Structures are given as structure tokens and as C-alpha cells.
Curated annotation (Swiss-Prot):
Function (record text): Interacts specifically in a calcium-dependent manner with the acidic exopolysaccharide (EPS) and capsular polysaccharide produced by R.leguminosarum. Could be involved in the development of the biofilm matrix made of EPS.
Name of the protein in question: Calcium-binding lectin RapA2
InterPro entries linked: RapA2_cadherin-like, VCBS_dom
One Pfam family hit: Cadherin_4
Keywords for this protein: Calcium, Metal-binding, Plasmid, Secreted
Main location: secreted
Entry's Gene Ontology molecular function annotations: metal ion binding
Domain of life: Bacteria
GO cellular component terms given for this protein: extracellular region
Protein's gene: rapA2
Subcellular location: Secreted
Domain-related comment: Contains two Ra/cadherin-like domains composed mostly of beta-sheets joined by a linker region. Proper folding and stability are dependent on the binding of one calcium ion per protein molecule.
Source organism of the structure: Rhizobium johnstonii (strain DSM 114642 / LMG 32736 / 3841) (Rhizobium leguminosarum bv. viciae)
Length: 236
């Protein structure tokens, strides 16, 4: 008797400068038409907040960000980016479990190949900031990044949204986060407007799963921005 659910193994190949993403469920099937990603590399994929909830899972050379709907992004670690030799390839192999929501499950294998590229490219180094509520929250995601051959760095995407540069380096793009709004510029500068009212001592974390930088000549890289904000007693 045929299984009511089937996971087909996945394989994807990207260059190290690509924004690495995809969906593991796109080639899978179930009799009832429902598919959910339940486990990835032995770790449960959280779904309490629905299909948009992100689970962060460490791989051998970077970090996977996966959702119950099967979508994923992958960000190379800084060590892997710097250690890539010309033409070298890294490979991540991960098992994953899917479900139809009715008790039927199956397991697939995901093989991710990442290829080194020849040009000297910009390298995006992950950013971590911590602020207290009431502080002027902001920074520049390009400050710790490494320029390529031409010495230029531009912010092109932020959390999946294109960063406008039509009005020059001071053009501002507004991007809504989980707890507030980012105001970002092509030169990497950002400010953050907290819209939630935090309790004293409460800490929330905004994670921008990737931002994409460019040298203006087609060479790109992606980094992660983590922003921690701690509530203060506004009545003091």
C-alpha cells in the first residue's frame, strides 16, 4: 500500500556570495494536500506562532533558519566565508521530517552545496547590538564588513526588502520588524523605532535573518543583524 505522504530528497547548489534559500516541501507530497516541516537535523521545528515561526539551527559551516512551511535560508559563518579557497566547495547534509498533520510522517535528506568563487568579493560580518529602551537605537551594518577589490560597500537588501538608493546614499527605506520599525540607508546606516512598550527588565530580540551587501559590480554577500532591546522603568 502506498504511503499517504512522501518526502523526496532535496539537493541545491549555490555560490558563496548568493543569498541561499529555498523550500524543502516543494517536491514532497501527501494524500490530504497538507505538508509541514516538523524536524530538521534532529531539532524540532517550532510552529506555535504559525507557519511564519523561524527556528535557528546550526550547521557545519553556517546557520539554517527554517519554518514549518518548509522554507529555509542559510547564512555562512564568518569563518567559512574567510576560509573559502578559490573553487573549493563545502557541503551540508541534513535529514528532515515532514508531516501531513494527521499523524503520517516521512523523512528526506537535504544536500546543500556551497561553491567558492574566484573574485575577491565583499564579506558581510554578522552584527550584534544591545540597547536599553529609551536609547537612540541605531548603527551601521557595513562598519565591520570587508570590502572587495574595488573598496566599495552598499546595503542592497534588508530582511528581504530592497533598500532604495534612487535618491542617493541618504535615501531611507522603512522596514517593519517584530517590535518596531527599521529605517535603513544604502550606506548601511540604520535607526530603529521601538513601537512595543516593554516591561522593566524585559528583553526582546529583533533578528534580521539576512541583509545583503554589494560592491556595486555584481559581487554580493549576506550577513545577520541581531538587535537586543531591554525594557526600562519609564516611571523612574
Amino acid at each position: 500500500m502506498a504511503s499517504p505522504i512522501h518526502a523526496t530528497d532535496d539537493s541545491a547548489t549555490f555560490q558563496e556570495t548568493d543569498v541561499i534559500s529555498g523550500n524543502l516541501l516543494s517536491n514532497d507530497s501527501s494524500d490530504n494536500g497538507h505538508l509541514f516541516l516538523r524536524a530538521f537535523d534532529g531539532a524540532s521545528v517550532g510552529a506555535k506562532s504559525g507557519n511564519s515561526q523561524v527556528t535557528e539551527i546550526q550547521g557545519d559551516y553556517g546557520t539554517f533558519f527554517v519554518k514549518p512551511d518548509g522554507s529555509y535560508t542559510y547564512v555562512l559563518s564568518d569563518a567559512a566565508k574567510i576560509g573559502f579557497a578559490n573553487g573549493e566547495s563545502f557541503q551540508e547534509k541534513v535529514s528532515y521530517k515532514i508531516s501531513d498533520g494527521s499523524g503520517h510522517t516521512d523523512v528526506g535528506l537535504f544536500t546543500l552545496n556551497i561553491q567558492g568563487v574566484t573574485q575577491v568579493k565583499p564579506i558581510a560580518v554578522d552584527d550584534h547590538y544591545s540597547f536599553n529602551e529609551g536609547d537612540a537605537i541605531g548603527g551601521n551594518v557595513l562598519d565591520n564588513d570587508i570590502a572587495g577589490d574595488n573598496g566599495h560597500l552598499f546595503l542592497r537588501q534588508f530582511d528581504g526588502t530592497n533598500v532604495s538608493a534612487k535618491s542617493g546614499p541618504d535615501a531611507v527605506t522603512d522596514i517593519v520588524g517584530d517590535y518596531g520599525v527599521f529605517h535603513v540607508k544604502p550606506n548601511g546606516e540604520f535607526t530603529y523605532e521601538l513601537t512595543d512598550d516593554l516591561a522593566a527588565g524585559q528583553t526582546v530580540t529583533e533578528t534580521v535573518q539576512y541583509y545583503k551587501i554589494s560592491d556595486g559590480e555584481g559581487h554580493t554577500d549576506a550577513g545577520v543583524l541581531t538587535l537586543n532591546i531591554t525594557g526600562t522603568d519609564a516611571l523612574v
